[in-house]
Amino acid sequence: RRRFIAGTAATAAAITAPYVSTSYAAGSLSLGMWDHWVPGGNKIFDQIAQEWAAKEKVDLTIDYLSTQGNKLLLTIAAEAQARAGHDVMDFSAWEPAQYSRQLEPVGDVMKEVLATNGPITEAMQYIGTYTGDWNVVPSTRGSLILPPCSRIDYFKQEAGIDLQAMFPAGKDPAPEAANWTWDTFLVAAEKCHKAGHSFGLPLGATTDSLDWVGSLFSAYGAALVDAKGNITVDTPEVRQVLDYSKRLYAFLPPDVASWDNASNNKWLVSGKGALIFNPPSAWVVAKRDAPDVAEKLWTHAMPKGPKGRFAPLLPRYQGLWNFSKNKSAAKSLLVHINKPDNIRKLVAGAAGYDIPPYQKLLDYKVWDDQGPPPGTLSHYPNRGDQRNVMPCSPAPPPIASQLYTNAIMPKMMVRI
């Protein structure tokens, strides 16, 4: 392994040179990765990582850890406490802030990645730089947003909205997309509800509930805690959201407060629902189990509020434990994984489920090629004026994670 001279020269070299010499065997490296649910999602990552390992003469092992039974979460906690285990781990949501003291700074990695891939979504940076420097590397693999997935026919017949004209396949949103606001959303919810096809919006203590509600709050500039940690519950913006949610709640299925993360998917796939907020997993299930429903689904942008159009983000990251014995090799691998060509392979291998955190890498054809109907996922990645947001931001991550874990926002909406 190449050893750099300490000081400024070392920093400059680290930015431009590989982290691992190809002249010598670089020991072993182990990864604990999220087990991708899309067939092929793990296979393509294996190919990319092992390609690097063969070139750099690294003995690389990859363990794919399921979220079922919290296996991945428990493994992270156990390794952090024992200060032993994998070198690199997969993290999600608020975990990089929770384990910041056990993570190796990776600002040198991110400097190289950003120089190649361009600016990163602010929502990813909000978590990844909580300590001041990057302590994790944002991941394309497993990162997703939860935009609307809607019935084309119900919207056209019952709400008078042509989603395919507003969000055409393979193109940016049409000018009339400016009219797709939360006010329009409320009117459409009422019309579809009266026609027997209510929007499937969960309001329980689940991630799906928190994610769409968080986007609603952001669209109105409402926050329960500000970036400095001050409580900001009693504001006109929060009151406006609560008033809106009271009106919306009347048009939802009566049991949404008890829904789990599968309930909204089932609602849509059953043919009962006109809209849910979800990544393409609901459409994939419909394509398998209810093809007559799948061919009528369209993924498109979030409604716009007074402060903008925000899509809920569920991010993933790779972090390097500060007790790793092969940090140089780990950093080299993280740079390799995040090269544009490899990001493109990851997105294609997951059939478009994964979303790159870099705006300049959102033009892949994989989303336009999905169907039926043709182009149904064209507007899954951000197009136009939509931005990603972490629910409960801009509160400092340790506070935001508690707001999120305790489902404060959806509970407020249910209880008013």
State the predicted function of each range.
Residues 182-192, 227-258, 302:
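Glycine-centered hinge/linker elements that transmit conformational signals in sensory
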Residues 87-90, 274-278:
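Paired acidic/hydrophobic, glycine-rich loop segments that form the ligand-binding mouth/hinge
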Residues 140, 374-416:
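C-terminal capping/gating helix-and-loop segments adjacent to ligand/active sites or protein-protein/ligand interfaces
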Residues 3-100, 111-121, 143-144, 156-167, ...:
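Conserved N-terminal structural module of periplasmic/extracytoplasmic solute-binding proteins
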Residues 95-99, 280-293:
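A ligand-binding cleft/hinge motif common to bilobed small-molecule-binding domains
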Residues 108-122, 163-178, 222-241, 288-292, ...:
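Short, solvent-exposed loop/beta-turn-alpha elements that line the ligand-binding surface or hinge
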Residues 26-27, 50, 54-55, 132, ...:
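Extracytoplasmic/periplasmic substrate-recognition and gating elements
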Residues 92-147, 156, 183, 296-303, ...:
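Hinge/lid segment of periplasmic solute-binding proteins
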